[in-house]
């Protein structure tokens, strides 16, 4: 047999040869350094036979990214072995521990166990210690193939492994991997030796998991681990995890009293508290200003609609699994609104339209309802009731590019306003091999070309994604990277040829004939709830002045300064700034600490000197820390704060 190397050269090998045999044929140094391989683009290990004619690339420590799935998988086996040794030291025999599945996942692995006594989080460091000892033993990892009957004989007391084996085909060999006295059923691939595994790993947590994900099955104990090629990468990952916890919008939402989710109200139905409502209104006011300047007309539609409306639009029954069930009212059926677009189409259709009337831009902060599985709900970012900054533009073909550019400009402005500058675009176009799309070829080609031209004019990076278009038109997704390096899809601009056709809407053209308008869907925020959740984490609750629910805290040093503090608060309040006075009996330092805990951006401290000169001492939270200024004239500070609010800075 032969295999082909990356440079095109061919190696002649014995039948049944492995990637290790290929490495040895090239040279002893490579055989020593090799950790795994890819064969025809698929990850494999050094122990698995190669197919004749395979194109292979050997993996060494020089390309740790390629090696990561291998060492994470093998560390999962090392952990499983360590758990066995841990319970053996407690006096349990090998049959007392039963193992479920244990795959490698992004950044690490997990393994499910049925244990004789539960493992606690505080036990994980001891398991880690045993793992490091197993790595230090330098055990060879070997692979063997056996029959189904032989495989079943390996696990006479483990019903989970027996069930997995019973589900495998009778006529195919079953693979086992071993290291020392530990053996497990596994497809692989794995590292060649425990001694080559990195020490940069950590066991993170334990949780319960139903066997095979079925709640009718027993609950097993799942242990999660993470691993990276270097300690530096592990440290960076752990830091990011801690930072993510610090920024978690669910935690900050409670601490800053922004929102709550009450089980009596219902899962996935957030209640906006006064502070959160201020934040929400700042977002909506910002968007309303932009929409007014760009010629949008505001509309309001009901939260339910006749089921026939959604039948006509196609949202029912095609998306019924993500919608709440219809309700019977008299002789008609109604449904909680899953989308705003059908309602906006009916507003467009409420009177005759001429080519001179177009474009028609209809905008609404419309609340919609989707049925999300309870396990998928997450604070504000995954909910069942949410409000979209939804707008629909009805335009002529010759207006499409201009309208698309304007929406693109608006969305980029929104992201820049909130400090989200690491943005890339995804242009979703048709799959040339598919016939699922509605609309004619000429219109599709025009829309795709004009979207790409619009993106190029803006000058931001983009990728073209064939097959990513909806069946009713091409689209543009905005993907934003936050301060933690996580990517979020924020907002979509979608061209739609389907709804105008389904609702048979038209405009009278210059030629006196009826023509079909093109419809554009756009929502720069996506949803107010999700965008707010992302903003909370992006800013870690330290909102800029204009966005902060509580903008100014005035702190009198003593009770005799309370009247002056209240006078300043009233002036700021009349000017439109959200100001409060902390007239509690706490010491000044405690008042400052409380204001900082609540992430109030500006603190004004007033005492005898400030009162006499109508001044304030300013303590301001910034992205770089705390900035202090003493003896600031109050009127000058008020003007400065108003200017910052006006400029949304």
Curated annotation (Swiss-Prot):
What is a biological process (GO) this protein takes part in?
threonyl-tRNA aminoacylation
Name the source's superkingdom.
Answer: Bacteria
Give the UniProt subcellular location, in the record's own words.
Cytoplasm
Known catalytic reactions: tRNA(Thr) + L-threonine + ATP = L-threonyl-tRNA(Thr) + AMP + diphosphate + H(+)
Q: What is this protein called?
A: Threonine--tRNA ligase
PROSITE patterns xrefs:
AA_TRNA_LIGASE_II (PS50862), TGS (PS51880)
Q: Which residues form the signal peptide?
A: none
Binding of Zn(2+): at which residues? 341, 392, 521
Q: Listed GO cellular component terms? A: cytoplasm
Q: Which residues form the TGS domain?
A: 1-60
Keywords, comma-separated and alphabetical: Aminoacyl-tRNA synthetase, ATP-binding, Cytoplasm, Ligase, Metal-binding, Nucleotide-binding, Protein biosynthesis, RNA-binding, tRNA-binding, Zinc
Record note on quaternary structure:
Homodimer.
Family recorded in the similarity comment = Belongs to the class-II aminoacyl-tRNA synthetase family.
Q: What is the purpose of this protein?
A: Catalyzes the attachment of threonine to tRNA(Thr) in a two-step reaction: L-threonine is first activated by ATP to form Thr-AMP and then transferred to the acceptor end of tRNA(Thr). Also edits incorrectly charged L-seryl-tRNA(Thr).
According to its UniProt entry, this protein's organism is Deinococcus radiodurans (strain ATCC 13939 / DSM 20539 / JCM 16871 / CCUG 27074 / LMG 4051 / NBRC 15346 / NCIMB 9279 / VKM B-1422 / R1)
């Amino acid at each position: 047999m032969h295999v082909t190397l990356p440079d095109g050269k061919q190696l002649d090998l014995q039948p049944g040869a492995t990637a290790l045999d290929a490495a040895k044929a090239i040279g002893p140094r490579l055989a020593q350094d090799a950790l795994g391989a890819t064969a025809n683009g698929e990850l494999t290990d050094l122990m698995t036979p190669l197919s004749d004619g395979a194109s292979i690339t050997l993996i060494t420590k020089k390309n740790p990214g390629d090696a990561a799935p291998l060492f994470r998988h093998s560390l999962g086996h090392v952990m499983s072995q360590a758990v066995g040794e841990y319970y053996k030291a407690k006096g349990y025999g090998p049959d007392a521990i039963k193992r479920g599945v244990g795959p490698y996942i992004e950044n690490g692995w997990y393994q499910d166990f049925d244990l004789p006594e539960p493992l606690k989080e505080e036990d994980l460091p001891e398991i880690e210690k045993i793992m490091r000892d197993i790595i230090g033993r330098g055990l060879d990892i070997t692979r063997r193939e056996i029959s189904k009957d032989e495989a079943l004989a390996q696990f006479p007391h483990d019903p989970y492994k027996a069930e997995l084996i019973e589900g495998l085909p009778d006529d195919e060999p079953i693979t086992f991997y071993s290291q020392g006295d530990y053996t497990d059923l596994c497809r692989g691939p794995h590292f060649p030796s425990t001694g080559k595994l990195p020490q940069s790993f950590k066991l993170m947590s334990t949780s319960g998991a139903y066997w095979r994900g079925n709640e009718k099955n027993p609950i097993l104990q799942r242990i999660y681990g993470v691993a990276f090629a270097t300690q530096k990468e592990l440290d960076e990952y752990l830091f990011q995890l801690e930072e993510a916890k610090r920024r978690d919008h669910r935690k900050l939402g409670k601490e800053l009293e922004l929102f709550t989710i009450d089980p009596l109200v219902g899962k996935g139905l957030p209640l906006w508290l006064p502070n959160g409502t201020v934040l929400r209104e700042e977002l909506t006011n910002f968007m309303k200003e932009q929409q007014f300047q760009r010629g949008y007309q505001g509309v309001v539609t009901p939260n339910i609609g006749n089921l026939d409306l959604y039948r006509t639009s196609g949202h029912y029954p095609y998306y019924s699994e993500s919608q709440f069930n219809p309700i019977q009212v008299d002789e008609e059926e109604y449904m909680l609104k899953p989308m705003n677009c059908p309602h906006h189409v009916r507003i467009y259709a409420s009177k005759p339209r001429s080519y001179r009337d177009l474009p028609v831009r209809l905008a609404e902060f419309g609340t919609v309802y989707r049925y999300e599985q309870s396990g998928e709900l997450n604070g504000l970012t995954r909910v069942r009731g949410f409000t979209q900054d939804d707008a629909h533009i009805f335009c002529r073909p010759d207006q499409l590019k201009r309208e698309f550019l304007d929406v693109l400009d608006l969305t980029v402005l929104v992201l820049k306003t909130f400090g989200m500058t690491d943005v890339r675009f995804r242009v979703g176009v048709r799959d040339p091999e598919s016939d699922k799309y509605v609309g004619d070829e000429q219109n599709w080609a025009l829309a795709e070309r004009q979207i790409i031209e619009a993106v190029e004019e803006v000058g931001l990076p983009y990728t073209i994604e064939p097959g990513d278009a909806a069946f009713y038109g091409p689209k543009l997704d905005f993907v934003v990277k936050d301060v933690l390096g996580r990517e979020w899809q924020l907002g979509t601009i979608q061209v739609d040829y389907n709804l105008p056709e389904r609702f048979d809407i038209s405009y009278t053209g210059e030629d006196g004939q009826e023509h079909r308008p093109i419809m554009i869907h756009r929502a720069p925020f996506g949803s107010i709830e999700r965008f707010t959740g992302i903003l909370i984490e992006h800013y870690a609750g330290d909102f800029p002045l204009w966005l902060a629910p509580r903008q100014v805290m005035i702190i009198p040093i003593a009770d005799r300064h309370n009247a002056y503090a209240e006078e300043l608060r009233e002036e700021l309040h009349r000017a439109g700034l959200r100001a409060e006075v902390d007239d509690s009996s706490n010491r000044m330092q405690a008042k400052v600490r409380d204001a900082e805990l609540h992430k109030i951006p500006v603190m004004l401290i007033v005492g005898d000197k400030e009162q006499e000169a109508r001044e304030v001492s300013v303590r301001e939270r910034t992205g770089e820390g705390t900035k202090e200024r003493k003896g600031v004239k109050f009127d000058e500070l008020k003007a400065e704060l108003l200017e910052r609010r006006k400029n949304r800075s």
